[in-house]
C-alpha cells in the first residue's frame, strides 16, 4: 500500500468562540451561559470553546479549572483550549486533555529592542506596501442549512442564506437576499469590516469576534436593507435608506 495514501496533514483555519471570564462565581457563569445558549442554540450546541482566564488572574480571582471544564461539557460545549491561566491552572487543564493556548496572534509578536550604536547613522525610511486582498468571492446559489462558506477576502452572496448555514469572510460580507443563518465578517480581526444585508433575520452576526445573536436582533427591521459595523467595540446596526 502506498503510505502517502493513508493520511495527510493540511493547513487550515479553525474557529472557536473565546469565553472571556470576568467573574469566578460558577453558578453565575452557568446561568449566563444558559441564557447565551438559549438565545442561539444552533450556534452554541456542541460548539468548541476556548476559555480565557487572563481577566480573572489579573484581578486575583481564582477559579477551579476542573469545575469550569466540567460545567462547559455539561452544557454541551467542548473546551479546546485554555488561555491566560496560571501554571497550576494550565497543568490541570492539560491533565483533563485541554491544551494551553498562548493567545499570541501574528500581530502580537514581541520584537527585541535594538540599540543603535552610532546615533549619526541615517534613518532608514520604511517601505510602504499596499496590502493586496484576494478578489471577492461571489455565491449565486442558495446557501443551505449545514453549509459553511469561507472567503479570504470579501464575500458577496446573491441568494438566500438558510438557518443553520454559516458564512465567513476575512473582509466585508454582502448578502443581497435574506440571511437566516450565521454571518462572521472580519474573522482575522479586521475591525473595519462591514456587513450589508437586504433582509437581516440572522441567528448570529459577528465582526472581528464581536457578535450579536438572534435575541439581540429582535428589534432589527425585517425586509429592509441594513449595514452592520463596529464602533467602540460594539456592533452598530443601521438601516440603509
Swiss-Prot record:
Family: Belongs to the MinC family.
Highest taxon, organism lineage: Bacteria
Quaternary structure (record): Interacts with MinD and FtsZ.
Gene responsible for this protein: minC
Record's protein name: Probable septum site-determining protein MinC
The keyword Translocase belongs to this UniProt entry's keyword annotation: no
GO biological process terms, semicolon-separated: cell morphogenesis; division septum assembly; regulation of cell division; regulation of cell septum assembly
Function description: Cell division inhibitor that blocks the formation of polar Z ring septums. Rapidly oscillates between the poles of the cell to destabilize FtsZ filaments that have formed before they mature into polar Z rings. Prevents FtsZ polymerization.
Biological source species: Nitrosomonas europaea (strain ATCC 19718 / CIP 103999 / KCTC 2705 / NBRC 14298)
UniProt keyword annotation of Acetylation present: no
Sorted UniProt keywords: Cell cycle, Cell division, Septation
Xref: HAMAP family: MinC (MF_00267)
InterPro entries found in the cross-reference section: CAP/MinC_C, MinC, MinC_C_sf, MinC_N, Septum_form_inhib_MinC_C
Alphabetized PANTHER family for the sequence: SEPTUM SITE-DETERMINING PROTEIN MINC (PTHR34108:SF1)
